[in-house]
């Protein structure tokens, strides 16, 4: 199955251009390997699944950003991330869902990693749990799953989770990737979907409609994506018009 992902580069305030990338995706299998339910010292609980070693390792990493369009995950793209992780620990973040990435990332790609842990962060209180921020900071690769970017912005922005992700990108310099909603929040400019998803027809008819909610340089900070806004699921539904509006 082929899926399109577009990235728009903004040279504010005048020049806008886009580049089209086409990937061929292969559907991964999802298998639950291990469930962990954590309680930290402040009595906040959160859900996490982990596969692999329980001992943290530190490896030599190379920074990079992996943007995925929200279709079936691309094996080569994730292999590229893990090759930059040097066999370290992988953390997957999401605000809902399951551990569907764990076994796929740990044992089905042929690139060794020490562990893969999926963490559900579905409230601002959980985004402030010190143990979660520490797990993120200790990662050698980070992947932000698809879902609803409005929840990522609402729950994670201006919290220790945001600080930890930016630490990985800019200080520790590890590979960071995202698909769908996880891709949407990686640009310096990002569509937050705070007022529900806007269609191309709605956005083109009124660029100032309440559904056109754009964040600017106030969340995640990647030098690779300065002056960039992303959008995903380009063919279903058609999102060319709304990204032009963005």
Annotated model-derived regions:
Residues 1-45:
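Bacterial Sec-dependent N-terminal signal peptides
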Residues 24, 128-129, 158-159:
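Polar helix-capping/helix-linker motif
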Residues 33, 89, 142, 173-176, ...:
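Beta-sheet entry/capping signal
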Residues 37, 68, 145-146, 177-181:
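Short glycine-rich loop/turn motifs that provide flexible caps or phosphate-binding loops at active sites
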Residues 44-151:
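Extended, subdomain-level signal for the structured scaffold at the beginning of enzyme domains
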Residues 154-241:
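Class I SAM-dependent methyltransferase SAM-binding "motif I" and its flanking Rossmann-like core
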Residues 243-246:
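Short, intrinsically disordered, charge-balanced linker/junction segments flanking boundaries
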